């Protein structure tokens, strides 16, 4: 009995010691500590010479906000594959492979939405309608329903706005693609890059209901609408079934400073300071070395993480990843 108590005491002491350790976000010490834990992922440097205020602003999702109506369950009788990647399932939909950059703005809530909406429009049209839905239009014109623009927002509000007001097209910064391309430039949060430095500053651009010069059709005629928007229960199989049937979804989770250093593998929180809530696009799932994961697209450019993507533990609502899933069905004709 005393041996069992001694073992339990040691485990408690080890856990307490680990939790009491503090590493500066983005530090070598944090990277080294993570990689010594023999966990399911590898850490490295993704951010160089950036203000911590910038990194915190990237996490611009207000968790636990307004809820959309929950979609009726339909996964019970479905037989789902052990792994699934929307990029491979719908190869004629190029937006699924795309990674965007939110720049110095807490607009992840808008990016997660417009990325998944773009994917779903293409999927529903069987590849006949390929459009980059405008993050700029969502960010600047949604208003109070979505939150506070570059200072943070609600994914549920974004999907509701799409069904009520519609969204125009718009590509990446300086792409001149679509009606309203993104106006906030990418910034250099990596090493030896050519982009301007990242800061925590940045106001929300103004809502402009005019397409950029030379683009047709008009702003009003360029709108793409959702016919429904909804939440999905915190159920692993229901989320998988939704992605399998209709395409990528938007999710949100709690970010700690160790996540900033993700390079490869299946992320599980190890240690680090709370950074905030972050919205992303979930596009598949799988199992890596026995660990189930969600396949996720981020909005921090392609030189973050695994070419802009990451994997996170699946099935345990890790960091709340399964608690705030939202999606919707486009009004795009179904072919």
Curated annotation (Swiss-Prot):
Catalytic residue positions: 108, 278, 298
Membrane spanning residue stretches: none
EC number: 3.4.22.1
Gene3D superfamilies reported in the protein's UniProt record: Cysteine proteinases (3.90.70.10)
Membrane association type: Peripheral membrane protein
Function: Thiol protease which is believed to participate in intracellular degradation and turnover of proteins. Cleaves matrix extracellular phosphoglycoprotein MEPE. Involved in the solubilization of cross-linked TG/thyroglobulin in the thyroid follicle lumen. Has also been implicated in tumor invasion and metastasis.
Signal peptide: 1-17
Keyword Phosphoprotein: no
GO cellular component terms, A-Z: apical plasma membrane; extracellular space; lysosome; melanosome
Subunit structure: Dimer of a heavy chain and a light chain cross-linked by a disulfide bond. Interacts with SRPX2. Directly interacts with SHKBP1.
Stated name of the protein: Cathepsin B
Organism: Sus scrofa (Pig)
Disulfide bonds: 93-122, 105-150, 141-207, 142-146, 179-211, 187-198, 227-331
Residue positions assigned to the propeptide: 18-79, 333-335
Keyword Transmembrane: no
Record field: catalytic activity: Hydrolysis of proteins with broad specificity for peptide bonds. Preferentially cleaves -Arg-Arg-|-Xaa bonds in small molecule substrates (thus differing from cathepsin L). In addition to being an endopeptidase, shows peptidyl-dipeptidase activity, liberating C-terminal dipeptides
Enzyme class of the recorded protein, top EC level: hydrolase
InterPro entries, sorted: Papain-like_cys_pep_sf, Pept_asp_AS, Pept_cys_AS, Pept_his_AS, Peptidase_C1A, Peptidase_C1A_C, Propeptide_C1A
Modified residues (N6-acetyllysine): 220
Tissue specificity annotation: Expressed in heart (at protein level).
Sites carrying sugar chains: 192
């Amino acid at each position: 009995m005393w041996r069992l108590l001694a073992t339990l005491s040691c485990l408690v002491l080890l856990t307490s010691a680990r939790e009491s350790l503090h590493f500066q976000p983005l530090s070598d010490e944090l990277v080294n500590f993570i990689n010594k834990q023999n966990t399911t992922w590898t850490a490295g440097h993704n951010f160089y010479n950036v203000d911590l205020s910038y990194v915190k602003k990237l996490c611009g999702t207000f968790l636990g906000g307004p809820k959309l109506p929950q979609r009726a369950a339909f996964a019970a009788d479905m037989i789902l594959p052990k792994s699934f990647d929307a990029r491979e399932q719908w190869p004629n939909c190029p937006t699924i492979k795309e990674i965007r950059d939110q720049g110095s703005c807490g607009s992840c809530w808008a990016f997660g939405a417009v990325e998944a909406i773009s994917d779903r429009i293409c999927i529903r049209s069987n590849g006949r309608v390929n459009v980059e839905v405008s993050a700029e239009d969502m960010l600047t014109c949604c208003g109070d329903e979505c939150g506070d623009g570059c200072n943070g927002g609600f994914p549920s509000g974004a999907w509701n706005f799409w069904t009520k007001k519609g969204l125009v097209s718009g590509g990446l910064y300086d792409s001149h693609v679509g009606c309203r391309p993104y106006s906030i430039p990418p910034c250099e949060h990596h090493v030896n890059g050519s982009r301007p430095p990242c800061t925590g500053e940045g106001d929300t651009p103004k809502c402009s209901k005019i397409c950029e010069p030379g683009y047709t059709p008009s702003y009003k005629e360029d709108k793409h609408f959702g016919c429904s928007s909804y939440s999905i229960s915190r159920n692993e199989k229901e989320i998988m079934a939704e992605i399998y049937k209709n395409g990528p979804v938007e999710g949100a989770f709690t970010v700690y400073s160790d996540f900033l250093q993700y390079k490869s593998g299946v992320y599980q929180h190890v240690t680090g300071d709370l950074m905030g809530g972050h919205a992303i696009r979930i596009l598949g799932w799988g199992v890596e070395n026995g660990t189930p994961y969600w396949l996720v697209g981020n909005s921090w450019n392609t030189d973050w993480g695994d070419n802009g993507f990451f994997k996170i533990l699946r099935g345990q609502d890790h960091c709340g990843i399964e608690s705030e899933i939202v999606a919707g069905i486009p009004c795009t004709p179904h072919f």
